[in-house]
Amino acid sequence: MQAVILAGGKGTRLFPLTSRTPKPMVGLFNKPVLEHAINLLKRHDIYDVTITLAHRAEQIIDYFGGGSKWGVNIQYALEDSPMGTAGGLRRLQPMLNDTFVVLSGDAVTDFDLKAATECHKKKSAIATMLLYEVDNPSQFGIVESDNGGKVKRFIEKPRQSEIFTNTINTGIYILDPEVISYIPYEMPYDFSRNLFPRLLENQEPFFCYRAEGYWCDVGSLAQYRNVHFDALTGRVKLNLPARRVANGIWVGDDVEIHPTVKLKAPFYVGNGVRMSRNSSLGRFSVLGDASTVEDDAAITHSVLGAGTSIGRGSQVYGSVLGSGIKVPDGRHLSDEVLVDDGSSDHLRAEISSELMSRHSSVEHAFTWSGLEVARLAAQLTSLRQLAA
């Protein structure tokens, strides 16, 4: 089976995180979001991957190359001008000779793609749209289907009066190669606005599949922050690049945590992190690789990129800090996004408290000392050495 990943978006709603980075390359636990998508494909034995590119394409090509590091074969299709979500597939027709999956390189999901593909083939579908239940469907496409799952009607971004379901189109599709014949050459073309209406008009076998698991399109700064929190609680299954030493606790290698440090799960501490005397790491906090937290500093409900530094006595709450940000001593940050642009002020944005309520408390949340966490990490290392 083959896959096409759409990775040409600019990600304007994620500014300033996307000021120098294409949206699919924004970090999620020290890996680009796009890398998590590739890992998902590999878990489902999909090794032949084509990535469509536009904005800052060179960053993606330089990072992933031919895909050998991830055990997949990656090809690239560069769009000189915007081709819409479906327009770029026409160029790929010669290489797409079997059922293939289309997904977005800036969404996070753990859907069972094998189950969706089996459903697609069982129904002899030409196209299958994966659906997911959300609280507010107004920003997505909604679908009406018959009892057998065949799509009858599709409404993109419905008005409030048009909403009849909270199950939405995720932008993940299982397609047969024949569907490409509906896409014109070298023209912008969209799945929702153009292709799907044509399939309905021609009464093609176009089905939907209600997927189980997790999906988020990472369409806002608040959603970006909360995807991290969802991973810490296990709502989404990701391959995190650190050791899980206890429930809700991930710790990387070469970590220095002073015995007086207080840590409250769930949290993630990357490789080479250093936490100094009497500092604290509250619930739902992520420390990127090589971050430092000085004496008496406190962090909670925040995501810190690699190489960040939190000064003595500073407090960071509900914030996202890009790689390399240095917070001076005694500062207080709340619901802010900071990205290094080479200036002393950095690029800044406010981040809403959207979705924070579901992460305000955790069942069985314990406070750990730095000494206890260090012991857990050491024990796990010893067990792995014995197993080897």
Task: Kindly label every feature range from the protein language model.
Residues M1-I61, V72, A388:
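N-terminal glycine-rich phosphate-binding loop and ensuing alpha1 helix
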Residues R13, Q59-D62, R91, D112, ...:
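Phosphate- and divalent-cation-binding pockets in alpha/beta enzyme and binding domains
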Residues M25, I142-S145, F196, C208:
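A structural signal for short hydrophobic beta-strand segments in well-ordered beta-sheet cores
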Residues T50-A54, L130-L131, V303, V320:
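Short internal beta-strands
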Residues I61-D62, G67-N147:
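Conserved beta-loop-beta/alpha segment of the NTase-like Rossmann-fold superfamily
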Residues F100-V101, V108, K114-K121, D135-P137, ...:
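Catalytic-core segments of class I nucleotidyltransferases/pyrophosphorylases
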Residues R243-R375:
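Structural signal for interior beta-strand "rungs" in well-ordered beta-sheet cores
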